[in-house]
UniProtKB/Swiss-Prot annotation:
Domain of life, source organism: Bacteria
Main localization category: cytoplasm
A GO cellular-component term linked to this record: membrane
Gene that encodes the chain: acpP
Reported modifications of this chain: 4'-phosphopantetheine is transferred from CoA to a specific serine of apo-ACP by AcpS. This modification is essential for activity because fatty acids are bound in thioester linkage to the sulfhydryl of the prosthetic group.
Source species taxonomy: Bacteria, Pseudomonadati, Pseudomonadota, Alphaproteobacteria, Hyphomicrobiales
GO molecular function terms attached to this record: acyl binding; acyl carrier activity; phosphopantetheine binding
Function: Carrier of the growing fatty acid chain in fatty acid biosynthesis.
Carrier domain residues: 2-77
Protein name, per record: Acyl carrier protein AcpP
Gene source species: Rhizobium leguminosarum
Subcellular location: Cytoplasm
């Protein structure tokens, strides 16, 4: 797992209080990890702060899984 993926995973665990083994690339924030719309907004803000990237609203709406977040951040930092 990449450094970005590890950091995303830690943020998700800290914000949602879920078990580490549930935070896999294919895990949906809402369907698999129990996040609500406020949680997803807070996650996006935490990703922006941690990685120093801006995630526009339209992009945030397409970040539905842990893997989506990792891919967006990797692309934004490239």
């Amino acid at each position: 797992m990449s450094d970005i993926a590890e950091r995303v995973k830690k943020i998700v665990i800290d914000h949602l209080g879920v078990d580490a083994d549930k935070v896999v690339e294919s895990a949906s924030f809402i369907d698999d990890l129990g996040a609500d719309s406020l949680d997803t907004v807070e996650l996006v803000m935490a990703f922006e702060e941690e990685f120093g990237v801006e995630i526009p609203d339209d992009a945030a709406d397409s970040i539905l899984t842990v893997g989506d977040a990792v891919k967006f951040i990797e692309k934004a930092q490239a």
